[in-house]
Amino acid sequence: MNDNELDNYIEAGRIAKTVLHKCAAEIKPGVGLAEIFEMVLDEISAAGVSHSFPPNISLNNCAAHDTASPDEERIFAEGDLVKLDIGTHIDGYIADTAVTVDLGDHASLCEASRAALDAAINVVAPEVVVSEIGAVVEETITSFGYKPIINLTGHALGRYSLHHGLSIPNTGKFGSAVLREDMVIAIEPFASTGSGLVHEAARAEIYQVIGNAPVRSPAGRKIMKKAEEMHGLPFARRWLNVPRAELALPALLRQGNLFLYHCLSDVPESFVSQFEHTIIVTADGALVTTR
């Protein structure tokens, strides 16, 4: 990794941290989910960098991939457990970070995922097998009396690439990949009061370009053009000001041009917490860009 790349990763992380904590502080009962969504984007833009995916704002048993819809009307309420997961990038060098805001009585659950993240970071070093990180996450979360979500993982980051091949498990039961110096990874433990497994819910608002098959409809071509402006990174349906988009999106999915991210949820009535940092693997261990 050259000095320019390192500087971009560090600055993207610094800004992501600042934006995350400023916006998380505004998550309160009575505040609209869309208000926080737009605040995150405004703060990232004001800092002079770009977002790397739509702000994920996931409530209660939903662990990941929820975000504001075009007609979003949800309001945070007393008792909610809100995961705010945001990303920035500078010239494609990404920071990905998340925090959980407790609007109820979930302090222990939040501490479980926060402590698991801290413990996992302490393990990071060249030649570490990723299952060793997962084992520490699992041990920490279970020590609090909760379950890690084992079918959600952290991930390697590349330039304009959020999921760059390598996964960082939240269990020690799998993962044979080995960390190397200069790898950039995001570790994100999820602790749950439920089953410890997520499923795809019906709700889905986030898309990503994955193909380039010919597109015939004008609406479809406009959507693909907007998506390509994201350099292949995910985008929200809320961002599409395209007539007939609701007809064009299913066609683009069928053609294999787009991928749709469904909300990932544990069982009803459960609660899930999440904390996340971006880390550069160094010769000495870990450089956390978002802390």
Where do the model's predicted regions map?
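Active-site neighborhoods and metal-handling regions in enzymes and metal-associated proteins
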Residues: 1-291
